[in-house]
Regions:
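Central antiparallel beta-sheet cores of small beta-barrel/beta-sandwich binding domains
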Residues: 23-110
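Gly/Gly-Pro-rich "capping" loops immediately C-terminal to redox-active cysteine motifs
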Residues: 163, 175-205
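Detector for the c-type heme attachment site
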Residues: 173-179, 195, 208, 232-234, ...
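Beta-strand-rich N-terminal accessory domains
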Residues: 249-456, 473, 487
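Extended acidic/polar, glycine-enriched regions
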Residues: 477, 485-541
Length: 865
């Protein structure tokens, strides 16, 4: 049996009016099955036809389970049903309005008790309420709604939808049990009596029409309103405020207003594709034609999962996906795209279609063990490998690290090709890189004519000491070129661009899918190659709006006061605001924060005590940012593919050039290899951690490591190995390190690791090149083992550096990504071994998990996200 998500009373009821039930057993019986410490709830429904009975076991999350071989003799019942695929036998006895018995699953028996559903002795009479809107105001939308049907259709899917609505909207005002919302007087479902009625229909009226300071929730559909009511009733009221849990009975449903429509259904939930990421989005993509591409394949268990043979799959591991057609909504709303892979300086391919990608991925649609893939028609592609030949030899042979599965990973040698960064100017995305000593600016584009789509690559190439060669597409693809000093040849199955040594001149490539008409006339009519320098000076801001939010002051009657600094969840770009890093500018009133969806935001008003925060989006389209650091007023961001230095070239508070400060990162298609945290030592060197492959053995040396990047960004060094999920870095006062790790394969519990020196191994035998000895003697012991029940996912640690924290100044904090807590780490050293324990800071329970934090140098307070 799979684990129940929540103990819920059955709300899927057949209407049996109490006055119509003549058989003492016929009707609905609320049941509870106890399995160890867990309880599974639902209803048993019995109907009599002549002398025989039919029945079902109806569970909130399992649906309807038919009772077969049902036998009722006197007050005894026996029958069979399937529970989550397991055959079960129910056997028990009725006694007046109660039922007791057992459910047998295999060789195990579990107790079941049930009580007949009945009407309350006194009919419920909801209060008279003065709503904000009148019945007339909502007549058009609510006049024919089947409320009984909507309540009766409650399901686990509805509960999950309601949870998403509550935790993305309602929580801001109402909060949760441990954390007060932004409006202290907002109703507390878990402890207070309802003023406007506590039955589902009255709650619906409150949501639809508004009451008191709560405005009508006009954007919610009828289904969504009842979804969030279900979540509130089952998650808060039933658990903690049971006196306010209204029993939904057949007679209650019969009294509700009649209607034949269930109104608008819940809106599809896909915030990952609704978001406007800007005109580019960096990620790892697989390019595949939706109709003819290689079928997606993932190895089955057992763990460690064996390597797939992906040598024929076209992965752009550091793929810059660029939207080519005009229009609002960013890359996700486009119809045509190209991907540039900055690992190897190649255009991986171009495609058209509806939807951009399939959005598969842990930080996209929350899916594990997968990666995003293009959807639509693939017009052309190039193989994984160098896009430009080695300028010294003219060879395309790939010299990069070869993994166990035969694939190559990591960037090309910088003397061969070197990615410089990306300019974002209006709708133009200009990619800057070098091949040999030649500096290149490249713009991807698309043009239409004569009934066909033609993709373009405009290149501005500085003079080169050597002639250059670039693979454009497979032979058979329709390719043409304009510009001086460039020609096309067929070599080894590919159309190859040859660029001779020449004075600076622009080149324009035209590429159309095989079978399209000749490009000769198209090229004659097309615009000439464009000079791209004008896009490197800084353009008008893409995100001009600033957004204001409130600071909700916390109570000061406990050990700690926690203020809630609300992000702008409602924003024009539908950014999900999943904050993943924080730091401060020289003016400590200004902070910068990154998000997992690729944004960087600047927030003003942190220390001026006005209670208003002003937010501005200053960067977008980055690859899973999970760390941010300000050094000398320069903003550095840890991304999965690179460390990015944000450059504002014209002073308008928005990034014009995304400089690749370091791109030594080795990136594979695996979903779990996050690059996490960002810290700097006194010399200016930068540090981040890279996670391993979850339930798989490492493929690359950087899997599960602590990494050092030199202060000039020119080199990366592995400091420590053997991590599974290293969520960030802490630098100690003596410039040793602390890195946490999460429980899982080879980690019996979560670890807090104190790291001194270089080259040591920290326990995950599925890391790269682990020791032969699998015993504890071969690995460094942690500072603390952290039990999963105490903190299921520790993140980054931070030393307290604030006199405002009194006796805790100089102590060590640990953030809980899993439980939204902050903990104090108590440590000592015995015989050279650092050891200790962790305790929760009293009264600190946050609305979300905590991953990063910094102490503000001005007010001395901790800011965490």
């Amino acid at each position: 049996m799979r684990q129940n998500y929540l103990l819920l009373s059955l709300l899927l009821l057949t209407v049996y009016l109490s006055g119509c039930v003549t058989d003492p057993l016929e009707g609905s019986w609320d049941y509870t099955i106890r399995v160890g410490q867990e309880e599974f709830s639902g209803a048993m429904k019995l109907s009599k036809n002549g002398s025989s009975y039919t029945g079902t076991m109806v569970s909130f999350d399992m649906g309807e389970m038919l009772l077969t071989n049902l036998r009722i003799a006197g007050n005894k019942l026996q029958g069979d049903f399937q529970w989550d695929g397991d055959p079960c036998i129910i056997d028990g006895v009725f006694q007046d309005a109660n039922f007791e018995g057992t459910v047998q699953v295999g060789q195990s028996r579990f107790p079941i008790v049930a009580t007949r559903q009945s009407e309350p002795a006194k009919p419920y009479d909801p209060p008279v309420v003065q709503y904000i809107l009148s019945d007339k105001d909502v007549k058009d939308s609510d006049g024919n709604i089947d409320h009984a049907g909507l309540i009766g259709d409650f399901s686990m899917e509805g509960y999950k939808r309601g949870g998403r609505i509550y935790n993305s909207n309602c929580i801001n005002c109402h909060g949760i049990q441990d954390v007060e919302g932004s409006i202290p007087t907002a109703h507390k479902f878990w402890s207070q009596a309802f003023k406007a009625g506590y039955d589902p229909f009255s709650m619906y009226q409150t949501i639809s029409k508004g009451y008191g300071v709560m405005p009508p929730q006009l954007t919610l559909t009828h289904q969504e309103k009842y979804d969030v009511i279900l979540y509130i009733r089952e998650n808060f009221i039933k658990k903690s405020n049971n006196d306010q849990y209204f029993p939904v009975t057949p007679a209650y449903l019969a009294r509700l207003p009649k209607g034949s429509s269930k109104g608008l259904e819940a809106k599809p939930y896909h915030p990952w594709s609704d978001m406007d990421y800007g005109n580019f989005l960096i990620n790892t993509y697989e390019l595949a034609d939706e109709k003819t591409g290689i079928k997606r394949f993932h190895s089955p268990g057992p763990t460690p999962y064996p390597d797939e043979d992906y040598r024929q799959n076209n992965f752009a591991y550091k793929g810059i996906a660029v939207r080519l057609d005009a229009g609002p909504g960013g890359v996700s709303a486009g119809k045509a795209w190209m991907i540039f892979d900055h690992d190897v300086m190649r255009v991986a391919g171009a495609w058209t279609g509806e939807g951009f990608i399939d959005w598969e991925g842990i930080l996209l649609n929350d899916k594990h063990e997968t990666y995003p893939r293009t959807i639509g028609q693939l017009h052309f592609e190039t193989p994984v490998g160098p896009g430009w030949a080695n300028p010294s030899t003219g060879s395309f042979e790939d010299p990069r690290f070869t993994a166990r599965d035969g694939r190559h990973f990591g960037p090309l040698p910088k003397t061969w090709a070197n990615y410089k960064g990306l300019y974002h100017h209006g709708d133009n995305v200009i990619i800057s890189y070098s091949v040999g000593n030649a500096a290149i600016l490249e713009k991807l584009g698309m043009e239409r004519g004569a009934g066909q789509i033609v993709f373009t690559r405009t290149l501005n190439i500085s003079p080169s000491r050597e002639s250059l060669k670039m693979r454009v597409a497979a032979v058979g693809t329709n390719v043409a070129v304009s510009g001086n000093g460039a020609s096309l040849k067929e070599e080894d199955g590919y159309v190859v661009l040859h660029v001779s040594t020449f004075s600076r001149a622009p080149i324009k490539l035209f590429i159309a899918k095989p079978g399209s008409s000749s490009l000769d006339e198209f090229v004659k009519r097309a615009s000439p190659p464009e000079l791209l320098d004008r896009y490197t000076k800084g353009g008008a801001p893409h995100y001009q709006e600033t957004l204001n939010t409130n600071v909700t002051k916390g109570k000061e009657d406990g050990t700690f006061a926690v203020d809630l600094l609300t992000p702008p969840f409602q924003n024009p770009w539908k950014s999900r605001m999943k904050l993943s890093g924080i730091d401060f500018m020289k003016n400590p009133d200004i902070g910068v924060l990154c998000t997992t969806d690729g944004d960087v935001w600047k927030v003003t008003g942190l220390t001026n005590n006005k209670g208003i925060l002003t937010w501005k989006r200053i960067a977008s389209g980055l690859f899973q940012p999970l760390g941010i650091k300000v050094l000398n007023e320069k903003i550095y961001v840890t991304c999965r593919d690179q460390l990015v230095l944000l450059r504002d070239l014209n002073g308008d508070d928005e990034t014009d050039f995304y400089e690749s400060f370091n791109h030594d990162h080795q990136v594979t298609d695996h979903f779990h290899e996050f690059a996490m945290g960002l810290q700097a030592d006194k010399a200016g060197n930068l540090y981040y951690a890279k996670s391993g492959r979850h339930a798989r053995e490492a493929l690359i040396p950087q899997h599960g490591t602590l990494l050092k990047v030199s202060k000039d960004g020119s080199a990366t060094e592995i400091i420590a190995t053997g991590f599974r999920a290293a969520n960030g870095v802490c630098i100690n006062p003596d410039e040793s390190f602390i890195v946490t790790d999460q429980q899982g394969y080879w980690n019996p519990m979560n670890r807090v690791n104190w790291i001194e020196g270089k080259g040591k191994f920290y326990g995950n035998m599925w890391g790269y090149n682990p020791p032969a000895d699998t015993s504890g003697a071969a690995m460094e012991q942690p500072l603390v083992w952290v039990d999963m029940e105490f903190d299921r996912s520790p993140s980054e640690l931070l030393w307290v550096n604030s006199k405002k924290w009194g006796a805790l100044d100089g102590s060590l904090l640990s953030f809980s990504y899993g439980y939204g807590k902050i903990q104090l780490v108590l440590l000592e050293e015995i015989n050279g071994q650092k050891q200790g324990g962790v305790v929760d800071l009293p009264g600190v329970k946050l609305l979300t998990g905590v991953m990063r934090g910094r102490f503000n140098p001005s007010d001395g307070q901790l800011y965490a996200c």
